[in-house]
Amino acid sequence: SLSRVRSIFPHFGIMEQQSGANGWNTRIEAPAPKPGQMTLWAMQSIAHGADYISFFRWRTCTVGTEIYWHGILDYDNRDNRKLKEISTLYNQVQLIRDLAGAEYLASFGILEDYDNLWDADVDVWHRRIEKISKQEIFVAAQLNHTPMDYVLLSDNTEYEELKKYPVLIYPHGLILTERRSVLLKTYVEEGG
């Protein structure tokens, strides 16, 4: 999810956004984006923090494993609806270019840390509740149009990074270091 990508780095790029039907000559097949779908995907990415979007690929290749991975231009190399959509998208993005580099404003954050993520990967009981809890919180936020962040909690996390969130949810934090405990206590004592 783009929310998870944003937790790693707040300003990211989409390297290979789909622009046509796709597939290899050995496996994989998927339909072409419907009219307007490339714009929808691009704007969704921008709304979630992307500062860069690159469409894969410019021109459909005529040989190789990705022969069926269609690009903006088809085999005939002529202008088409996909090129028109990308051109229109470019003009739309120019109107909002000042948003590039803007901070995503989340209403709440879901705290995560590697100790508990790794524990949930190997502990059959922890895994069941960890994954479903986070998934349901994410789905509820999406359905209610409530912007949220995943927030990586480590022993290097500072209070300043947490205080911007009015609400933090730390589902099933079974492993907690002394440093993180003090940090969360400070967050609560300061009104979080």
Predicted regions: what they are:
Residues 1-192:
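Carbohydrate-binding surfaces of carbohydrate-active enzymes
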